[in-house]
């Protein structure tokens, strides 16, 4: 049975449909990613003045940081059409050809999870990006022939959470690579405050700070927490969300002051109580938690590592002193974390 979706998951959830109303519509409304915004603004303005298609753009970064939103803003700022799809959806070369041949001049085609394109589809994409041509094989066997189709000059905007899985030929064809970083608490406060205004609920500065601190540096999570806190405020007939309401709501949702949820705390406490703080292998943790290895490595661990609660060492996963302090546990006296993980690669 599939586990319930986590409140603090950066991945898109089915209940995130309300997230659309909170999204900024222009670069000037987009909070955070200052350098990325500044560069994009220049590139867009230059392309607009020349009347040319913007060079191909690649957004790289963890989920929930605004890659899709920025792609939509790019098309809106350019005043052109926007088509969106994702890597897994484009199963064969014909699917990609259908998308590309329907694009108008200077349109934006957005491909999310572009690292999941099949090699066969990538081969068709290369000449389309570079020469704005499609090279297709029509027919089979001796009757097969190559056909070239001219395309409108378009902008491909790709998004990926795993840049290392992109092939070099594909990566090199993006003239504008942009890396998105986690947001600061101050930036998330601005996002929460704007979101509250859009949703028509009052928000005090300390209420916005409380939500922002627990949003794990991710706007998608901040918006999700805001919508749930608004429910608590509405049920209490409160005209505004303050720190007390936000704290009560988020505590009821099991999101603690550091943004950790029940799964995070279970992971940390399992290592602390069952394995003396580690090191312990990821396969052992997968068995102990009844979770697949991929879920542990891609969903649970990144934020714990980012916050300094966990180390990946050659000998396994190791809790830091910070983790024991957060759990309210005493650190084992015979442990010396500073001597572990200084050399070698992460464990398999």
Swiss-Prot record:
Its main location: cytoplasm. It is an enzyme of class 3 (hydrolase). It catalyses: ATP + H2O = ADP + phosphate + H(+). Residues 1-20 are annotated as: Disordered. Keywords: ATP-binding, Cytoplasm, DNA damage, DNA recombination, DNA repair, DNA-binding, Hydrolase, Nucleotide-binding. Residues 257-348 are annotated as: Head domain (RuvB-H). Residues 184-254 are annotated as: Small ATPAse domain (RuvB-S). It is found in: Cytoplasm. DNA binds at residues 293, 312, 317. Its EC number is 3.6.4.-. One of its GO terms (molecular function) is ATP binding. GO terms for cellular component: cytoplasm; Holliday junction resolvase complex. ATP binds at residues 22-23, 64, 67-69, 130-132, 173, 183, 220. It comes from the Bacteria. The RuvA-RuvB-RuvC complex processes Holliday junction (HJ) DNA during genetic recombination and DNA repair, while the RuvA-RuvB complex plays an important role in the rescue of blocked DNA replication forks via replication fork reversal (RFR). RuvA specifically binds to HJ cruciform DNA, conferring on it an open structure. The RuvB hexamer acts as an ATP-dependent pump, pulling dsDNA into and through the RuvAB complex. RuvB forms 2 homohexamers on either side of HJ DNA bound by 1 or 2 RuvA tetramers; 4 subunits per hexamer contact DNA at a time. Belongs to the RuvB family. This is Holliday junction branch migration complex subunit RuvB. It comes from Bradyrhizobium sp. (strain ORS 278).
